[in-house]
């Protein structure tokens, strides 16, 4: 019986690279995508499907967690709140693009699905540099989430949450992704736009800076 990993894939660079690294480690990948009615949900879903096809994933889930939009309080799900432009967040206070406890919600659901599918690992593409003050993107948080899942599931089930990128910066992530032949042109990072990336939001700026520092050109289309 092959070992299985549940890979949370948003459609972005980091989670996609994590899935490729899981495959390299010999895991059978079960792919998981969350639809929480974020601004770019349709583009992210399209990217997820293309990435699954590229990885030859046989089993995938797209789960509706739109209640996150009902909770609100962030610019990703509330279009009345402007996405900050042309500034990277360097504060310890989470920016308005922070979705409260999003990774906690995702990992709780992933823990349930991992137990059902008998996965020994969960891969999630959290990156502390990208965290921009996000408290649920730290290594410490992930370790506590793993303890929580293992405490709340059956005694004969134990899962390891793997975060191979957590200490890397964006340039190193780009370099590693290209080394592993990850099709980054299939990924999407923009918080705001679905046709052409805005090039101005925090996520676009981090992505562009990563490509620039790595010495490569990003193949996706940008408005600016």
Swiss-Prot record:
<comment type="pathway">
    <text>Purine metabolism; 7-cyano-7-deazaguanine biosynthesis.</text>
</comment>
<dbReference type="GO" id="GO:0005524">
    <property type="term" value="F:ATP binding"/>
</dbReference>
<dbReference type="GO" id="GO:0016879">
    <property type="term" value="F:ligase activity, forming carbon-nitrogen bonds"/>
</dbReference>
<dbReference type="GO" id="GO:0008616">
    <property type="term" value="P:queuosine biosynthetic process"/>
</dbReference>
<dbReference type="InterPro" id="IPR014729">
    <property type="entry name" value="Rossmann-like_a/b/a_fold"/>
</dbReference>
<keyword id="KW-0436">Ligase</keyword>
<keyword id="KW-0671">Queuosine biosynthesis</keyword>
<dbReference type="GO" id="GO:0008270">
    <property type="term" value="F:zinc ion binding"/>
</dbReference>
<feature type="binding site">
    <location>
        <position position="204"/>
    </location>
    <ligand>
        <name>Zn(2+)</name>
    </ligand>
</feature>
<feature type="binding site">
    <location>
        <begin position="9"/>
        <end position="19"/>
    </location>
    <ligand>
        <name>ATP</name>
    </ligand>
</feature>
<feature type="binding site">
    <location>
        <position position="201"/>
    </location>
    <ligand>
        <name>Zn(2+)</name>
    </ligand>
</feature>
<feature type="binding site">
    <location>
        <position position="190"/>
    </location>
    <ligand>
        <name>Zn(2+)</name>
    </ligand>
</feature>
<comment type="function">
    <text>Catalyzes the ATP-dependent conversion of 7-carboxy-7-deazaguanine (CDG) to 7-cyano-7-deazaguanine (preQ(0)).</text>
</comment>
<comment type="similarity">
    <text>Belongs to the QueC family.</text>
</comment>
<keyword id="KW-0067">ATP-binding</keyword>
<feature type="binding site">
    <location>
        <position position="198"/>
    </location>
    <ligand>
        <name>Zn(2+)</name>
    </ligand>
</feature>
<keyword id="KW-0479">Metal-binding</keyword>
<keyword id="KW-0862">Zinc</keyword>
<keyword id="KW-0547">Nucleotide-binding</keyword>
<protein>
    <recommendedName>
        <fullName>7-cyano-7-deazaguanine synthase</fullName>
        <ecNumber>6.3.4.20</ecNumber>
    </recommendedName>
</protein>
<dbReference type="InterPro" id="IPR018317">
    <property type="entry name" value="QueC"/>
</dbReference>
<dbReference type="Pfam" id="PF06508">
    <property type="entry name" value="QueC"/>
</dbReference>
